[in-house]
């Protein structure tokens, strides 16, 4: 049996991930309406942390540190492995989703780093270039408006 993968990505490409054999899961406080994905809200940063970071009262370093503290109080490894064992043989793995297009601007890259260091779990950003030919009709992000609304 092939090992199942854990990838990260953003909501706008949920259909791409699903169409290519990955089961999507939201790791955000709010999942966009109509998004066909499961949820792991325990991996989302707190509202206070998110708001502080977005409006500049918390630095990037503090955000990372506080998010790591939050993750260390959760059973992150168990939460992720529970999702992996529910996959069908045809499914390649799971994709952990949030809003930011750029993974460096987002908690999903912090979560991936945390899992790599704490549990030796290899979690990488989903490579959309690999599936470019399959999805060439999808030039516009499905949830572009939501991303704009959150950035205000």
Which residues fall in each region the model found?
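Residues lining hydrophobic/aromatic ligand-binding pockets adjacent to catalytic sites
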Residues: 1-152
């Amino acid at each position: 049996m092939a090992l199942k993968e854990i990838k990260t990505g953003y909501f706008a490409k949920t259909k791409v991930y699903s169409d290519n054999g990955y089961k999507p899961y939201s790791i955000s406080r709010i999942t966009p309406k109509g998004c066909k994905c499961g949820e792991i809200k325990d991996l989302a940063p707190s509202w206070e942390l998110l708001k502080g970071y977005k409006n500049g009262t918390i630095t990037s370093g503090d955000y990372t540190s506080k998010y790591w503290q939050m993750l260390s109080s959760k059973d992150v490894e168990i939460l992720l492995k529970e999702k992996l064992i529910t996959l069908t043989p045809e499914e390649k793995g799971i994709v952990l989703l949030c809003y930011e297009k750029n993974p460096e601007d987002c908690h999903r890259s912090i979560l991936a780093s945390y899992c790599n260091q704490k549990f030796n779990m290899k979690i990488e950003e989903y490579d959309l270039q690999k599936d470019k030919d399959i999805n060439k009709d999808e030039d516009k992000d499905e949830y572009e408006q939501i991303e704009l609304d959150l950035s205000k």
